Amino acid sequence: MIKRYTCQNGVRIVLENNPTVRSVAIGVWIGTGSRHETPEINGISHFLEHMFFKGTSTKSAREIAESFDRIGGQVNAFTSKEYTCYYAKVLDEHANYALDVLADMFFHSTFDENELKKEKNVVYEEIKMYEDAPDDIVHDLLSKATYGNHSLGYPILGTEETLASFNGDSLRQYMHDYYTPDRVVISVAGNISDSFIKDVEKWFGSYEAKGKATGLEKPEFHTEKLTRKKETEQAHLCLGFKGLEVGHERIYDLIVLNNVLGGSMSSRLFQDVREDKGLAYSVYSYHSSYEDSGMLTIYGGTGANQLQQLSETIQETLATLKRDGITSKELENSKEQMKGSLMLSLESTNSKMSRNGKNELLLGKHKTLDEIINELNAVNLERVNGLARQLFTEDYALALISPSGNMPS
């Protein structure tokens, strides 16, 4: 059972106890990411995430790393378009210690100038590494094709130019503006008692920051076709279709539809593109949901001489799906697969912590396992096939990275 508590300052705490495990996962979730940036500070959310590990007033960067290594724990962080998360997984006996270290990073990071300089170079290398992975960067190009100059189209890593401008003052200002109590959720899952909520509150329940009023601009969904010429071994193709926002009433219809289309080895795309025609090693689809927008993405990578055939095969798969719909067998298989994935994820304290943290941060509510199963069971052929006809139109965005940069016809 999930326990929810809101501190006096607005910080929300969610805790789910599972006495059958010996681990505890703790996540500090903040409702800010690259979407909340301006062009001048694009990448600051991600860089701030890096700098949290570079030293506090009581610990050096090495001591932060050693803090978790010596207890056999794990600590990490990630930045997305709409949120940032710092998390740790430790044995239950070390839960309070892990909380203390995470809180120390949150409240007492020093942003030392020498560490800033070194970490900028680390992120420069991360950007270069990303540039050397066209199967990754093509997704950023698709975001640009879909959202244009809106901040949802910004790269999470930022650019070398914006990164160069960051300093301790700009990081502290960004924290002041966006790391405010109303944007913070602490999610805890594992073998932990409800009294741990009070331990979290001691750290996070009293700090104050007014922050910055941010009425987010709703993005328009563009259907640009962007190409980039790059010396690669393969052509990397992405198609983007307008999807559904977080919490949409038909989100489970879309989850099932995406799974049938390209979410598994038995999916239409995998079978048509890879198994039947041998055109690609990697082909898949996925859905991204944001506060007020969403996108269903199809990706395929193939030799440049097979790009046209790959594009045609994807279009044929979509046309067949729209015309004939999915079958009752595909529907039932997909629903059972989703249920199985959900049940297996519940065995992981990290997965529970992540699920609860995101639900609290983005939706402000939680569904029980039975409620989710009931919603999946309610998905039917009419709803899924109707959604397929609605989504898969000629109005889609496209991104391509290839040696020639030539668009498939």
UniProtKB/Swiss-Prot annotation:
InterPro entries: Metalloenz_LuxS/M16, MPP/UQCRC_Complex, Pept_M16_N, Pept_M16_Zn_BS, Peptidase_M16_C
GO molecular function, one term: metal ion binding
Disulfide bonds: none
Cofactor(s) for this UniProt protein: Zn(2+)
Active site (record annotation): 49 (proton acceptor)
Pfam families given in the database record: Peptidase_M16 (PF00675), Peptidase_M16_C (PF05193)
Cofactor: how and how many bound: Binds 1 zinc ion per subunit.
Enzyme category, top tier: hydrolase
Top-level taxon: Bacteria
Keywords: Hydrolase, Metal-binding, Metalloprotease, Protease, Zinc
EC number: 3.4.24.-
Binding site for Zn(2+): 46, 50, 126
Residues annotated as transmembrane: none
A GO biological-process term: proteolysis
Similarity section: Belongs to the peptidase M16 family.
Name under which the protein is recorded: Uncharacterized zinc protease YmxG
Gene label: ymxG
